[in-house]
């Protein structure tokens, strides 16, 4: 994930592209991803679950000649670019220029949001236009996303929050421990909003291993999950 087989105790430059610069980075468990200034995404590191998004399970960045311009761009779909990215232990999500979200990698708790437990990004023809948008509900787009260890959350365009994936310790914020996103009929309009309190809206979201926090529009923070 540092693009070398060596362990570094001081910072080293990661060569991602000769023509584009990175504008943000995100680190998952065994992998990392960068959002470039043209809206494209590149990922490297461990790839057992397809979390790099290249349609295989091949690690990248651990051998000579795998980084810089040799590192592929993640296929997000026809003319789609990313505005932000979030990486977790075994999956990655991108918030796209149209406000929709795509996720790939491990999906054992439905953390990708596709109403099943099938990994995405670890097989051929699973990325690009074949990778569906996460159904956030009728008419809703996202403005912020966060990926926890095995769950994902989004702040929607109305300031409300939705979360899906593992919920063993209440990290989804629904007052129960029921996983969501791993079965049919659990996403879209069926997925509830997190109750942030009367009149409260979120402006950004952050997810940890087993908990989640939201920054509210009044500058206060609310957190839920394992404590």
Describe every region a protein language model picked out:
Residues 1-8, 13, 45-67, 105-127, ...:
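Short glycine/serine- and acidic-residue-enriched loop/turn motifs that recur at repeat junctions
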Residues 21, 28-29, 81, 88-89, ...:
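Beta-rich catalytic cores
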Residues 31-34, 43, 91-94, 103, ...:
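Conserved core positions of repeat-based scaffolds
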Residues 5-19, 73, 77-79, 128, ...:
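Trp- and S/T/G-rich repeat-edge/linker motifs of beta-rich repeat architectures
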């Amino acid at each position: 994930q540092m693009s070398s087989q060596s362990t570094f105790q001081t910072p080293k430059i990661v060569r991602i592209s000769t023509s584009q610069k990175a504008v943000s980075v995100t680190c998952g468990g065994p992998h990392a991803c960068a959002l470039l200034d043209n809206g494209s995404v590149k990922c490297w590191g461990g790839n057992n679950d397809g979390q790099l998004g290249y349609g295989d399970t091949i690690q990248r960045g651990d051998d000579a000649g795998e980084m810089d311009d040799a590192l592929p761009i993640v296929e997000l779909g026809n003319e789609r670019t990313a505005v932000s990215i979030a990486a977790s232990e075994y999956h990655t999500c991108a918030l796209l220029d149209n406000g929709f979200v795509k996720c790939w990698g491990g999906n054992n708790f439905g953390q990708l949001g596709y109403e099943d437990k099938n990994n995405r990004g670890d097989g051929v023809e699973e990325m690009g236009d074949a990778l569906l948008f996460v159904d956030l509900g009728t008419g809703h787009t996202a403005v912020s996303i966060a990926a926890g260890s095995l769950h994902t959350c989004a702040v929607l365009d109305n300031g409300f929050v939705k979360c899906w994936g593992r919920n063993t310790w209440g990290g989804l914020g629904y007052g129960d421990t029921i996983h969501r996103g791993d079965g049919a009929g659990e996403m879209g309009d069926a997925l509830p909003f997190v109750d942030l309190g009367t009149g409260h809206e979120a402006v950004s979201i952050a997810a940890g291993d087993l908990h989640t926090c939201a920054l509210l529009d009044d500058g206060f923070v609310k957190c839920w999950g394992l404590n």
